Amino acid sequence: MAGAARHGDRLVMIDERGELSYKQLDERTNALANAWRERGLKSGEGVAILARNHRGFLEAVFAAAKCGTRIVLLNTSFAGPQIREVAQREGTDLLVYDDEYSDTLRGIDDPPRGRFRAWANEPGDDTLDALVEGADTSGPPKPDESPRITILTSGTTGTPKGAPRSEPRSLSLIGGLLSKVPFRAHEVTELCVPMFHALGFMQAIVGVGLGSTLVVRRRFDPETTLDSLEEHRATAMVVVPVMLSRILELGEDKIEQRDLTDLRIIFVSGSALGADLARKATEAFGPVVYNLYGSTEIAYATIATPEDLRADPSTVGKVVRGSIVKLFDENGKEVPEGESGRIFVGNLSQFEGYTGGGNKDMLQGLMASGDVGHFDPEGRLYIDGRDDEMIVSGGENVFPAEVEELLASHKDVQEAAAIGVEDEKFGQRLKAFVVLRSSAKLTEDEVKDYVKDNLANYKVPREVVFLDELPRNPTGKVLKRELAERDEKGDGKASPKTNGKAPSKKKESAKASSK
């Protein structure tokens, strides 16, 4: 919290409780750290945090860091069994949580150093506020160990894994970020992404380092976000693509009613932005969209600037300074420009291997991102699809992402996803799941014809299922595992070809939204 000395009374956060200054954050986190140390918390022990976006989250992180602990950021969508599994695996000695998760935490043994409420509906001795009131606000002794942060993977393919990091060995990657995205000192940043997510956490840390003001809310609402951008004269907004899409769905009039002239940066990551959404966002807000390609494990790889997106809105941009990106074929040889290959990334901010054991594939000291892509002559990277999602249909390689992006560009389609399914004739074919725009009508044959008119025949989905919504995790990634499980159970029947709003659609959507 060296920033507190430099930024003092400047606001570090505005949340639903009001304003919090850097000085207050420093003093409150000193008090929390001292209170926890009195309760026996030691360097190297584990502090788990289950909280939404508010000051309590940030206070818990900085207090735990001042104690030199292992900080584990829990996903707020986890069910009780997942919480128990992660807490046991990561070693939780102290737990910080919001009141709304009390039921989720039932049946979980109290950690040895206690559990404390960050967002409390009712006051009590177990709240962070109560600990702060009775504790010394002077700086705690320097811990014996440096703090470590563990961010959990999204869990889209199974049980979330812990991806730990120690203090950064170099600031080169942050320098690379700032060379691509013009974040400045004293930004006012509308931080919509959950801070337990890699993108949200990193932008919170970068913001604090720059003396910025973070504007946060516990739940995302698109219209409230627009109001907040105008009210606080925000200069930057950090979102995942599905959030940006929901803002744009409000319509041109709602956006133009607000004075957003201060907004210089819309920083997007967390899942694929897509060319159509990139175009629409640029049309609505101007050339302020920056698209980051990276992950919890590999950190930053590339960033598409407004100039890159103007040249081609489907690109994820050029390699960030401080990172290395290479593409390899199945034999481990680097592929020529323009050819697809597995994406491998190297930098000094990558994770240290999963806490439960295992790691990502490594080649020549570089880490696999899990995606396949290609470079254009200007050095811009394009994502062709997930390495593990590619199917072979009639001897041809097919990536669902290409079909998904095409379907999303249809005027009647809100969003779409595709998975590979077995096919007697072709070996594998795609199955598409489509969400229509409000009051739109589209038949299965019309969807197939649209793909056939724009892509090769072997990329046309064998089936099309219409849903009310796609199953997603809290940061907007489509849970294709759930779609595949439904297909294996025989629940994913194609909708009748006469009308995309057929009665069977409700049956499909009910299953898609159950969690």
State where each predicted segment sits.
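Conserved pre-ATP/AMP-binding loop-to-beta segment of ANL
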Residues: 9, 123-125, 129, 133-152, ...
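Conserved AMP-binding/adenylate-forming core of the ANL superfamily
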Residues: 11-54, 58, 62, 79-84
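Conserved AMP-binding A3 loop
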Residues: 21-23, 148-172
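Conserved structural elements of the adenylate-forming
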Residues: 26-31, 162-185, 245-248
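AMP-binding/adenylate-forming catalytic core of the ANL superfamily
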Residues: 56, 78, 97, 227-229, ...
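Conserved AMP-binding/adenylation subdomain of ANL enzymes
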Residues: 171-188, 196-236, 250
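Gly/Ser/Thr-rich phosphate-binding loop
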Residues: 209, 234-238, 250-312, 324, ...
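Conserved ATP/PPi-binding loop(s) of AMP-dependent carboxylate-activating enzymes
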Residues: 318-322, 333-364, 396-398
